[in-house]
Amino acid sequence: MKSLFDRTRVYTMTGEGSVSAEGADGIVVSLADNGSLALKDGCSYDDFDALCRANAQTDAEILLYIPALDEEQRKLLAHCAIRNAMWNRILFVSAAHKTLDALKAEYPEARISPVCDDNMVRPWIYAAYMGAPAYLMEAKEILLDADAWGSPTVDRAHNANVCIFAIGADDEDTVKALVRVGCDAVLTHDAVMARGLVW
C-alpha cells in the first residue's frame, strides 16, 4: 500500500524552531493549557508567531497540537497563521475534538486533525466527517493489524481519502513497518534516522 503523498512524510518532534537543518517535512509543537507554546522550555503565542516567520520561507509544515481553546485563543492562533502566510501549512491537531470542530466552523479553510486512540471505532470515517485531511494515531495501534501485505487500518483511511499520521515512530523497525504499510507520515524524535528510511 502506498501513502496518499508521494512518500511517507517525516515530522520532527525535537522542539526546534526551524526544521530546515534536519530536512524534515515539518515540525510538531504543542500549545500548553496555559497558552504557552511548548518548544523547549515553554514559550508564548509570540513564539508561535516567530516559529511561523522562521518557517514561512521554507516548505515546512507545522503540526500544532492544541488543547481545548476558547474563541479568543482560536482567533489569535488563526490570525497569527494567516498574517505569516502559513495558514495552508499548519495542521491543527488535538484530542479536544470540540475545539477542532469550533475552529473548522469559524475558519472553514482550517486544516484540522483529530488525535484518535484504539477506543475509537472507525476513526477514518470520523475524520472525514469532521473535514479533516488526516488523523493521528499511535504507531503501535496502526501496526496492530498489519501483516506482510499492509494494514487494514491504513487501507480504510486511504479509501476514505484521509491520511493517517503515526505518533511514536522513534526506531528503525517501527518506521520501516509504517512505510511498508503505507502510513502517510511519521512523527519522530529522530528525523535524521526516519528521513534516511523514507527517502
Describe each region flagged by the PLM.
Residues 1-199:
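Phosphate-group recognition and catalysis centered on beta-loop-alpha active-site segments
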